[in-house]
């Protein structure tokens, strides 16, 4: 097979792999505006009159950039150099929550069991925080009391109450952004689909393989909107510990039927 000009149908997915065992540690499937870039430093070699004899290039670099259509927790963890923590029954995650609850018979019931003491609740008026009430041993005109998930509001209070608290969850995910942790080197494979230019029913599988890559953490922007994209950039690197010919590879482009 000796293919040349093809139609790039789409970049199907991208995976990040652990350098130690090759396991997949992240996968993206909604890639937009993918771009593969290479660059090198050039130096002009001239004669005594300044005429160009040749040009030498060195320090070649490779980079892949794209936007993921959806917010990705896997990508966020890789960008922050963090682990994706999964909660369980034996290792729960503390989750902050806010609730707006309607007073019924002088009480409100929280959706979750608080993991720590709730010291304040707030009366809402026109959707805004109006009056702050403090925890007491028993409900009074200025204090509320709490038993498990049930709060007895101050005497005579009706309407909406705002409560902010924390609870333990066995069904949660957490990614921490530490000031002292940065992205680690990973393997990268980008899977694409090509079509024959003369017969679009003939398809080819394309793969971009980088043995070593690192997510660029110099500037990470995560759009916190429904229509925002999760952008990222990966720098490809040669393997300095591999003295073979393949060790100098930044990446390979492979196309097969």
Identify the meaning behind each predicted range.
Residues 1-79, 132, 206, 210-231:
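Solvent-exposed edge beta-strands and adjacent loop segments
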Residues 24, 28, 39-42, 139, ...:
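Conserved short "hinge" loops at termini or chain/domain junctions
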Residues 57-59, 100-104, 140-148, 224-226:
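Short, ordered beta-strand-loop transition motifs
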Residues 58-63, 153-162:
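Extracellular interaction modules
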Residues 63-67, 162-164, 189-191, 231-235:
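Beta-strand secondary-structure signal
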Residues 68-72, 167-169, 192-198, 212-219, ...:
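Beta-strand elements of well-folded, non-transmembrane domains
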Residues 74-141, 166-187, 193-204:
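Extended beta-strand solenoid/passenger and fiber regions
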Residues 126-127, 143-148, 153-156, 204-257:
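Mixed-charge, glycine-accented linear interaction segment located at domain edges/termini
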């Amino acid at each position: 097979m000796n293919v040349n000009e093809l139609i790039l149908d789409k970049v199907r997915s991208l995976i990040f792999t652990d350098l130690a065992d090759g396991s997949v540690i992240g996968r993206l499937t909604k890639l937009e505006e993918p771009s593969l870039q290479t660059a090198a430093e050039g130096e002009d070699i001239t004669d005594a009159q300044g005429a160009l004899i040749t040009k030498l290039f060195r320090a070649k670099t490779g980079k892949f950039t794209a936007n993921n259509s959806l917010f990705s927790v896997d990508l966020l963890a890789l960008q922050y150099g963090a682990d994706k923590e999964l909660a369980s029954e034996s290792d729960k995650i503390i989750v902050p929550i806010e609730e707006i609850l309607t007073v019924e018979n002088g009480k409100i019931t929280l959706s979750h069991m608080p993991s720590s003491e709730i010291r304040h609740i707030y009366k809402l008026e026109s959707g805004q925080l109006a009056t702050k009430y403090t925890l007491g041993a028993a409900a009074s005109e200025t204090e509320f009391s709490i038993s498990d998930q049930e709060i007895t509001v101050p005497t005579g209070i009706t309407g909406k109450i705002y409560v902010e608290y924390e609870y333990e969850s066995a069904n949660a995910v957490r990614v921490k952004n530490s000031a002292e942790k940065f992205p680690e080197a990973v393997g990268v494979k980008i899977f694409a689909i090509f079509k024959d230019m003369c017969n679009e029913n003939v398809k080819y599988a394309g793969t971009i393989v980088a043995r070593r890559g690192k997510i660029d953490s110099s500037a990470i922007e995560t759009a916190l909107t429904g229509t925002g994209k999760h952008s990222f950039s990966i720098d490809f690197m040669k393997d300095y510990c591999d003295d073979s010919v393949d060790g100098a590879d930044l990446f390979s482009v492979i196309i097969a039927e």
